[in-house]
């Protein structure tokens, strides 16, 4: 994924009301940008961090600038725009970067499925194999005690729990079901379920794996010009 036009940078003052952030632009002026992330953003929104933002062509938008990447004061790059996780995963599948998901004939997004009124992020299909249901989760929480350790989720997620139940049902019914962690933090080298944050999610994930749900972890190469989801890393839910 290339950023066209190129991203601009500013310094973060504060994030608030979940969807907004005040920044200081390179000109010295201050302003408010949109934050497409409803999560806790732990470690991703420290005042003084550098913010890389895109600019919308829509002149009717109240906040034309969107926060895409955080460059932390420790030098890490983090894609905080949660919309990008699905886009990057679709690109990675189409480019053949995720070898476990090669060979399918059709790719669909946001398809209704399950008994809990869900929409699957990505549905792959082919004439010679079962359908493949893929739920994508963005990982940006870096542990501050163990180098390289990332966790998901960063807050209790009832929505994520629902998705695990739906994936489990798909696997039990004979479809291929995959939970794909899109690691969008340059400092994360391995991923684990955050038992200390959401014990129910960790429990449901173990049950899902026993039922046949596969877990894939792919890490993105991140720069202020391009992001590519193309490197497999380890997952642990022991």
Curated annotation (Swiss-Prot):
TM stretches of this protein: none
Gene3D superfamilies in the cross-refs: 2.40.50.580, 3.40.1350.60
Gene transcribed to yield this protein: sfsA
InterPro entries in the record: SfsA, SfsA_C, SfsA_N
Name this protein carries in UniProt: Sugar fermentation stimulation protein homolog
UniProt family annotation: Belongs to the SfsA family.
GO molecular function annotations of the record: DNA binding
């Amino acid at each position: 994924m290339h950023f066209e036009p190129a991203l601009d940078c500013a310094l973060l003052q504060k994030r608030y009301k979940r969807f907004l952030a005040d920044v200081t632009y390179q000109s010295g002026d201050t302003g408010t940008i949109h934050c497409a992330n409803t999560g806790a953003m732990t470690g991703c929104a420290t005042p003084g961090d550098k913010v890389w933002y895109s600019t919308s062509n829509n002149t009717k938008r109240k906040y034309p600038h969107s926060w895409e990447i955080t460059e932390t004061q420790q030098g890490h790059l983090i894609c905080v725009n949660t919309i990008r996780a699905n886009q990057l995963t679709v690109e990675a599948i189409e480019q053949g970067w995720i070898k476990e998901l090669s060979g399918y004939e059709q790719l669909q997004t946001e398809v209704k499925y399950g008994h809990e009124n869900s929409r699957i992020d990505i549905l792959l299909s082919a004439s010679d194999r079962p359908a493949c249901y893929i739920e994508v989760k963005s990982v940006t929480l870096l542990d501050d005690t163990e180098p390289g350790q990332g966790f998901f989720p960063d807050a209790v997620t009832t929505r994520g729990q629902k998705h695990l139940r739906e994936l489990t049902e798909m696997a039990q019914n004979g479809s291929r079901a995959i939970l794909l962690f899109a690691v969008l933090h340059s400092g994360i080298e391995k991923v684990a379920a955050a038992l200390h944050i959401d014990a129910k999610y960790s429990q449901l994930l173990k049950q899902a794996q026993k039922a046949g749900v596969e877990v894939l972890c792919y890490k993105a190469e991140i720069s202020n010009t391009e992001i590519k989801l193309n490197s497999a890393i380890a997952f642990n839910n022991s």
